[in-house]
């Protein structure tokens, strides 16, 4: 933004129609072509709709509420972000259905999420992948009136960065969550983009598919613990979304 425009609103700045090359902009500058953004938004929305899948675009990189609004207007189910600080920004910008695509370990963040969900003002979901993580969540909301946490059980790959590797452990964590009426299991998730050795060539493809099948298997175990009519089955990146669609389509039941 030009120095002379600092302190103005976004709408006022855009209305001023500053010239990128003659105004007092500070470089370097990244610019986005509006037509390209709109093309990408509509293309992904159309792709997901054609398959019967919902999209919760990850907005951690742009963190631009105006772009996120366009994605929601195009049919996105909600938004994904990386942590609670990002969730706070998007929530304060008017977006109420948010998935934090990570475990949340900070007690103050967990307590705030529980307050928002409990008040009915928002639907903020985050990951749990262990009994230790569950215990942190439970301890964080002890003093929160009407606390409500919405969680996805994260499934992980062997030698991966996070997530439950063992479906027997998944059953144990689910059984513990069921004892706590403040915590709502919404479904399962996993990030296929970080599967060790995964890719688009030869045996790399099967490694991705095996992991996605593990998520589907986990969903079948998790479904009886979900209080909603539909379970959420989610996977992550932008590299293998076609494999995700093919493998998740094999889930036999109602899902989001």
Task: Tell what function each PLM region has.
Residues 157-256:
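Active-site loop/helix belt of alpha/beta enzymes
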Residues 58-198:
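Active-site-proximal beta-alpha core segment in soluble small-molecule metabolic enzymes
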Residues 41-49, 68-72, 138-145, 178, ...:
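Surface-exposed amphipathic alpha-helices with a cationic face
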Residues 25-26, 36, 199:
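Glycine/Thr-rich beta-alpha phosphate-binding loop at enzyme active sites
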Residues 13-17, 36-63:
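N-terminal glycine-rich anion-binding loops that anchor highly charged ligand groups
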Residues 32-35, 39, 62, 85, ...:
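Conserved active-site and cofactor/substrate-binding residues in soluble primary-metabolism enzymes
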Residues 12-32:
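Generic N-terminal amphipathic, Lys/Arg-enriched alpha-helix
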Residues 1-16:
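Eukaryotic N-terminal low-complexity, Ser/Thr- and Lys/Arg-rich leader segments
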């Amino acid at each position: 933004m030009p120095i002379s425009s600092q302190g103005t609103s976004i709408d006022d700045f855009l209305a001023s129609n500053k010239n990128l090359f003659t105004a007092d902009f500070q470089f370097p500058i990244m610019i986005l072509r509006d037509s390209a953004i709109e093309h990408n938004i509509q293309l992904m929305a159309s792709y997901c709709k054609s398959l019967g899948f919902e999209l919760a675009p990850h907005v951690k990189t742009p963190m631009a509420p105006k772009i996120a609004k366009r994605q929601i207007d195009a049919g996105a189910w909600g938004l994904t972000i990386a942590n609670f600080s990002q969730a706070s920004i998007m929530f304060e910008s008017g977006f109420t259905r948010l998935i934090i695509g990570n475990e949340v370990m900070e007690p103050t963040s967990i307590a705030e999420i529980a307050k928002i969900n409990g008040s009915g003002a928002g639907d903020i979901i985050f990951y749990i992948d262990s009994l230790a993580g569950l215990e942190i969540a439970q301890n964080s909301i002890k003093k929160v009136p009407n606390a409500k946490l919405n969680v996805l059980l994260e499934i992980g790959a062997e030698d991966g960065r996070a997530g439950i590797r063992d479906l027997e452990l998944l059953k144990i964590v689910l059984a513990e969550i069921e004892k706590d009426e403040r915590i709502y299991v919404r479904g399962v998730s996993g990030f296929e983009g970080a599967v060790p050795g995964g890719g688009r060539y030869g045996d790399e493809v099967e490694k991705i598919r095996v992991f996605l099948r593990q998520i589907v298997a986990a969903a079948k175990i998790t479904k009886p613990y979900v209080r909603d009519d539909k379970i959420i089955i989610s996977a992550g990146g932008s590299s293998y979304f076609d494999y995700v669609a093919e493998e998740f389509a094999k889930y036999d039941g109602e899902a989001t």
